[in-house]
């Protein structure tokens, strides 16, 4: 029964391909088998739940219930007394839009289009709605499942089952590459192979591509191709903005697009479809097993599937050439073939595309998977080793606080704010490493002092009072970084007034008094001590000379005390500036 139904479905698909110009808009329209139809329905229901409840998820029971109702409704079979989930009309609309945007048709659409051809109805009347329903629902497995339950599980049967799963996985991956090569709008194919082999394009990259495709109303693959072409071929004026989320996936997307370009190049440059098909499968095989252990079951499965499909392509091409030879025996050699202009010679590789379409149609006509839960929710069924199910891949990462910005963008903004806070507000000179931090004047201390009431040197002296007080002398002193001079408060005021009168408008700069080789440093509030000499005019009176003598004595008496605060290399640097 199952073989009969599968053969009937294959004949229906062949009839559809013969009349594709009257039934669809593009020759490269691909078909959804039973498994792909179920996956598309699952994604449609999850999208509908997200719109109504905010969660992109759906239970297996709801999917199977809606699947049964969908088959009966599309085949115009009675749906009375059948349960249906809420918002079924919305789910059906999302499902139809998904297939339309992906340039795909399901098997029920093919059946309905073929039924619409009144001239060839007798050719496919053998397919009835009930037969197609049994084929899509997998009722032919009912007896087999009951007999399998009585058979105990052995290590050999488990090993064979695992090998079968790996074979199905390898077959699905290679067919996804071929499907994308024929139909660039197939989002399901992109979801399967975007990160196989590992290109660093995980769930986040697929989510960014999906959002960009929805915004531009394009397919996921075309959005990725457009982005990479803009970066590679466009100038600065055409480059994507730095805020584009796809910029973080440039390397992986470029690797993926360049690989598909290599397959397109083989498809367009090799006129022989048999050779072209073999090379395409060989390139895909080498890409998948590159860097893998040759003894790995996945690598063995890839090699076996590629060899089997290569042989199948050659058989398809041989059968097509035989049909063409029989149909053109009564045509004169001088007479051109039908539809040769703008069809057969429009682009090189059309024969290869036809062969690949036949191969994809045969895959769509295969019986559905027995285990629906494994097909829809198994993480390892989709991607080898580090897999993610199709439902999880299409689900966007959860955002906190109902933020519309992606998680990556919010993290970048937070990191930028931290960098701004970490910037130093204190500007130091290139010689700041030679001064001790305890001699630096803090900004808070300056804000607490009335600048209009006291001179600059007096403010510096008062700020350093807690650090530079000499109990033996009994008065406040200024502990400079390299001058080692201690002055009386009243004398400091006189000297600072004289220095201020000499500098004039340069009062905002750093001031320094050079007294007999000893320096007095008056610093700005945010600047480290620097060396600017302010010469004091010589006085002829004896009182001034006595003042200088006292200053020199005080400096010599406190020289040892100040040396204790020197750091390594400071004495040499001080001697250099004295010269």
Swiss-Prot record:
Mark out the compositionally biased spans (Basic and acidic residues): 486-496
Which keywords does the record carry? Cytoplasm, DNA damage, DNA repair, DNA-binding, Nucleus
> InterPro entries recorded for this chain?
P-loop_NTPase (IPR027417), PARPBP (IPR038932)
A Gene Ontology biological process term: DNA repair
Query: What are the protein's GO molecular function terms?
Result: DNA binding
Q: Provide the protein's localization.
A: Cytoplasm; Nucleus
Q: Which GO terms describe its cellular component?
A: chromatin; cytoplasm; nucleoplasm
| Tissue distribution | Restricted to testis. Overexpressed in multiple cancer cells.
Q: Origin, by domain of life?
A: Eukaryota
Q: What is its main location?
A: cytoplasm
Positions of the UniProt region annotated as Disordered: 480-543
Q: Which family does it belong to?
A: Belongs to the PARI family.
Q: What does this protein do?
A: Required to suppress inappropriate homologous recombination, thereby playing a central role DNA repair and in the maintenance of genomic stability. Antagonizes homologous recombination by interfering with the formation of the RAD51-DNA homologous recombination structure. Binds single-strand DNA and poly(A) homopolymers. Positively regulate the poly(ADP-ribosyl)ation activity of PARP1; however such function may be indirect.
Q: How does it assemble?
A: Interacts with RAD51 and PCNA. Interacts with PARP1. Interacts with TASOR.
Query: Known PANTHER family for this protein?
Result: PCNA-INTERACTING PARTNER
Its domain description in UniProt is:
Although it shares some sequence similarity with SRS2 yeast helicase, does not contain a functional ATPase domain suggesting it has no helicase activity.
User: What is the recorded name of this protein?
Assistant: PCNA-interacting partner
Q: Which species is this UniProt entry from?
A: Homo sapiens (Human)
Q: What is the lineage of its organism?
A: Eukaryota, Metazoa, Chordata, Craniata, Vertebrata
Name of the coding gene: PARPBP
């Amino acid at each position: 029964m199952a073989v009969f139904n599968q053969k009937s479905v294959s004949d229906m698909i062949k009839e559809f391909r013969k009349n594709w110009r009257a039934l669809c808009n593009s020759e490269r329209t691909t078909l959804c088998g039973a498994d792909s139809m179920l996956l598309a329905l699952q994604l449609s229901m999850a999208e509908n739940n997200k719109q109504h409840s905010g969660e992109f998820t759906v239970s297996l029971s709801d999917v199977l219930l809606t699947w049964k109702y969908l088959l009966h409704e599309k085949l115009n079979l009675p749906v009375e007394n059948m349960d249906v989930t809420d918002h079924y009309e919305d789910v059906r609309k999302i499902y139809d839009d998904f297939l339309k945007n992906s340039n795909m048709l399901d098997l029920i659409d093919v059946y309905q289009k073929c039924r619409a051809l009144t001239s060839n109805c007798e050719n496919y009347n053998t397919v009835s709605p009930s037969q197609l329903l049994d084929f899509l629902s997998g009722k032919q497995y009912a007896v087999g499942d009951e007999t399998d339950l009585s058979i105990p599980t052995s290590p050999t049967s488990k090993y064979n089952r695992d090998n079968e799963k790996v074979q199905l996985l390898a077959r699905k991956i290679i067919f996804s590459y071929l499907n994308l090569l024929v139909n660039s709008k197939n989002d399901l194919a992109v979801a399967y192979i975007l990160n196989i082999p590992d290109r660093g394009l995980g769930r986040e990259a697929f989510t960014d591509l999906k959002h960009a495709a929805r915004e531009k109303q394009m397919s996921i693959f075309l959005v990725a191709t457009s982005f990479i072409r803009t970066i590679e071929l466009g100038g600065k004026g055409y480059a994507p903005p730095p805020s584009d989320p796809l910029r973080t996936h440039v390397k992986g997307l470029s690797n993926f697009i360049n690989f598909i370009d290599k397959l397109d190049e083989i498809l367009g440059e090799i006129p022989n479809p048999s050779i072209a098909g073999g090379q395409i499968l060989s390139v895909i095989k080498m890409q998948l097993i590159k860097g893998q252990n040759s003894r790995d079951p996945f690598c063995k499965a890839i090699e076996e599937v590629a060899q089997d499909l290569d042989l199948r392509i050659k058989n398809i091409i041989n059968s097509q050439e035989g049909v063409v030879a029989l149909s053109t025996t009564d045509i004169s050699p001088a007479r051109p073939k039908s539809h040769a202009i703008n069809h057969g010679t429009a682009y090189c590789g059309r024969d290869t595309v036809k062969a690949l379409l036949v191969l994809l149609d045969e895959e769509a006509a295969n019986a559905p998977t027995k285990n629906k839960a494994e097909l829809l929710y198994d993480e390892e069924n989709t991607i080898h080793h580090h897999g993610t199910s199709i439902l999880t891949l299409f689900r966007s990462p959860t955002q906190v606080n109902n933020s519309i910005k992606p998680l990556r963008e919010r993290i970048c903004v937070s990191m930028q704010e931290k960098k701004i806070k970490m910037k130093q507000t204190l500007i130091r000179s290139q010689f700041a490493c030679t001064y001790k931090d305890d001699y630096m004047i803090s900004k808070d201390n300056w804000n607490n002092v009335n600048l209009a009431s006291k001179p600059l040197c007096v403010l510096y002296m008062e700020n350093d009072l807690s650090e530079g007080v000499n109990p033996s002398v009994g008065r406040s002193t200024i502990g400079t970084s390299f001058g080692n001079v201690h002055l009386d408060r009243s004398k400091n005021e006189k000297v600072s007034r004289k220095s201020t009168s000499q500098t004039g408008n340069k009062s905002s700069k750093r001031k320094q008094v050079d007294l007999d080789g000893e320096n007095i440093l008056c610093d700005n509030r945010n600047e480290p001590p620097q060396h600017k000499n302010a010469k004091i005019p010589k006085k002829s009176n004896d009182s001034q000379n006595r003042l200088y003598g006292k200053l020199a004595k005080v400096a010599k008496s406190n020289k040892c005390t100040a040396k204790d605060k020197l750091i390594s290399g400071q004495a040499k640097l001080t001697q250099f500036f004295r010269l």
